């Protein structure tokens, strides 16, 4: 018969592929369960209020038109719904595909069973497949994996959340219109069961059997599979556990399969008492907590409570004397085993001869250890007992008492067993690899000894007092030949023959009185020794390694091991070299990967890599978590060192008087520093002792592990310091900003110095790590803050700054800002608010408008540089850009609402436009015409002013940031600054040359050079924020004349001061000149340059017309508004870096030259 798993056996390959896919689906479900968007849980009030109207459960399907109608009625809900779709469609699609694959899995399994039934596979029926060893394993696994999928989904992704995600996917994707979509079936299968994994939650009635029966499966198939599992040892594991008391451990994998499959046939659990008694007697006579898949544990006492037959059958196991007997037995086993294992682990104890002579003894010890560890870990686990269930609590307390449970002792036994197992495996692997060479070498040695003895008895080779003996000569030659003829490939015959040869050599010594000659005796003894070694060597079988692999399975502890993390970390803190022992435990845990990967590998599935990566990644994550105690302890010591260096140790001057030496010695403090530094070095050594290890398919390099751990701890501490240090009280007078920045700078300097100090002791690049991680923290927080302004948000798993190994912590927001960078930015905006402060450009200083006291100045930005570095300034700059974009977008909406939808306003503007055309002319009776137009549009200006001033204020801040960045770049990195300036000028020259002569080269649109150089220029402050285009715009009617009117409306609020320029006339009616100019400049910059030309022409016309009118008076004087308008033009060309001729085209140059003197 063809091998069931052969590639040409279609029947075997079909079921193998199904089972392989089942394991891959479970891995995907486990992976995705960590990425459920929290918004679908609707846990906190903010989410409920914001998204409650757009997230629906399955009640949506009762009346989709009603729900959609409610959304369409409110444009803001529609907008939120669209934004929500853009942000979540990718992850929703991934979840849907996983859910769909579960449904497809059971459909494919049912189709396979139908094909078997209908005889599609020649000579194969359900019965014949179940008779085949691989066939019955695969059929049992196929149904079991489906059950595990359903349980995993319900445990990891709550029913309500599933429903909301499915409805969201249905609404947002094309699934509703797709004909071949099986959305209905998926929704029926995965609708909420009412189950909750929260502790103390009540179990729904008929759960999980009603859930398992949502897709009908052949009754015959289920009962036949249960029958097989009841009667057979389908994995042949009993041979690896010969002792009867280990039988339940031998059948543990099969027991887990049967436990899950029984839910597909509830009558067995409810009423088949004899069957359940048989099942319990075979699988659960001495255990009631089982692991069903990769460490997912269940307590039969709890889960079988609703089933009469199952509960009754289990009562014998849960009988108090039985529990006491089992727990006491394992207590005794541990007491006797632990010293034995520790003896084996002593240096030099496990020698090759000892191992080869004691294989059964060593394997028995390993078996007993693993069985004891398994029973105790499962039956004492907190997760296995519901604390709200009194009976479960009693059983747990009894187990803990009777087994004398001590988690530290159990953990130590696990460590020692893993180490023992690891050493034994390594020895066996080496012996197996050398087996043939050694055997041949012993054979050669033995044969040569016999040949030499034959030569001795020939009389040719002189040996003291050995007479010539032809019989013995011939006999020894024959023995040499026999030894030489032994064949390695036929180990059974060779072994038998070797035993006979040993006997013959013993007999020849006795019969021929050869004992009298010591040298001959020695030759014979040596040969016997070599023959014995040959027997030992031929007995080194791979079966021993296979048995060790089966016995050493630790997959049941995949999740439970986490409960020992604190003990592991405490052990490492006390003794860092403990890491070497932990390595063996992690490798033992890695063997759990064999379970899900076996079938995937057999099927040559492409899923092998992704599933291996998932489980290996989870294990490596756990290894990192355990070893994180080393960086944590290092940083604790480091904090003490920095405290001593900063506060206690006085810096030694370059010149020192001899008699002052004792004062500066400070031996106690320096000894303390040395002691702490030594502790840091020991921790480093501890982690580096763990050799490079392959955990699953991921290579773990201890040096990298240490560096990542140090980075993680640094990130955690710096992020916490930034979060706590930059929280501001908006009511505080004066602002807390500068004091807090100074404190922050001191804190960051402490971290920086400590890193500088530590780098040589732990062999890392301190400055490089510091810069990389601080920039990552700042950039990540800026990204999170900017998400508030983005429609399509950047999720953590999409962020280039967030990392799974070195995560940046997220903190709940304390105000409207998401992060510390947002709080810092808003505090700066608050204290430089143009409504309460006046910015004097020549001084780079903000003054309070009422008290005229200085509020802050450009030193603020050097303080930010000291505390957050250039990354912080750069991040602040990026955030201000987003804020400006938002303000400009709001402004466009405001313009459309106030101007373009107001008919009377448009009439006023149209009339004014007629009067001022042509702009080169002069408006007669200008004062009256302008004031009438301003009066009619009066309502518009407050909101307009607010928007312009906000943009202007942020542009002032951006200029200051650019100045600080440019200064520090030229100071700290003059070569970079010079290179960037030259490069920038060269590119601009090339672009200008290209526009004059298109045959010359120029960067094309798809070339990223311009984007990359822009990022560098902005980081170095070599840019002008006022030239930036923030938004794309369309033509707006009346735009130049509206801005002109707005400016003229604001001029009466301002007055000219020879020393300060334009200042606010009345603090009660606040306005700040520089933000006003920069706001208008930025706004006009977003549109076509002809708008700016028209706007400047209108101001020129206003100046000329007003001067014309004022000179006709008896005492001509220059009106204040004209001075304001002239100042505006002067400042406009100054800030925009335009040539003066631009405004001189509209106003005669002598007026510009003289207006200050006239005033």
From Swiss-Prot:
Annotated compartments: Early endosome
Alphabetical list of InterPro entries matching this protein: WASH_strumpellin (IPR019393)
Disulfide bonds: none
GO cellular component, one term: WASH complex
Protein keywords: Endosome, Protein transport, Transport
GO biological process per UniProt: protein transport
Function: Acts at least in part as component of the WASH complex which seems to regulate washc1 nucleation-promoting factor (NPF) activity and is required for its membrane targeting during endosomal sorting.
Assembly and oligomerization: Component of the WASH complex.
Family, similarity comment: Belongs to the strumpellin family.
Protein's UniProt name: WASH complex subunit 5
Organism: Xenopus tropicalis
